[in-house]
Amino acid sequence: VNSNFSQTKLNLLDDRNQISSVITDLNPDVVINTVAYPNVDFCETHHNEANLLHVSITGDLVSVCSDISSPLVYFSTDAVFDGTKSIKYTEDDITSPLSYYGKTKRDAEKIILNINENIVLRTTVVYDWHIRSRFTNWVLKNLKQGSKITAFTDQSNTATIAGDISHSLFCLLDQHHSGLFHCAGKTCLSRYDFAIKLADYFGYDKKLIIPTISKNTQSASRPENGCLDSSKLEELINFQLCNIDQGITSMINSSKTIPDIFL
């Protein structure tokens, strides 16, 4: 966090009653809610926790932001879809989540979008030099060590370089747009294909990557097709999101060696 900004730390689950007063006192121009349980399998077996964080607390944020006339930004997911579509999903497609995680995110979207000034950004498989870029870090760490990994061939997403998300969001805010938008990379590919791309670009042995399928390996169902069409966003802000080659190249150019913290 930039040290030029003030910080107030809250445990949203334990300090829920303080959310309204803290935000009201700050009176921000915009509130960006990035809080979530990212572990889909955890949410499948912890309904109360997932519902509290994703839905109930989102409702609290919507209420206080409405009171102080500050737009609220919410990050959502491809998991709101069932994955049966043969092409990329658009914002107009009907949601039908397979997992409890997806259900809570869909329910949160509905609460957010009840207020016209708010923004929902759906994205998927975010990657970059960041400790939370779990798939990318896991692949690169193991391949660098010469360890074999398995990667699914039956689940596809439009992996998204983090910088594209931040740029797109600032464009939306600066231009005073609101509503529901998909913000994801252009290339629809499986986790296996993504891992192969990473091996190619970083010079690691692709033979270490073993293709597998997700059946019976995850407690929560995922959409087989989680690919998002971001044309609406791109046209609105006049910006083209990266395909997978452009995204990985951008990642490499921003740091010529892999930072130790990610390995």
For each predicted feature, which ranges?
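NAD(P)H-binding glycine-rich loop region in Rossmannoid oxidoreductase-like domains
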Residues: 13-53
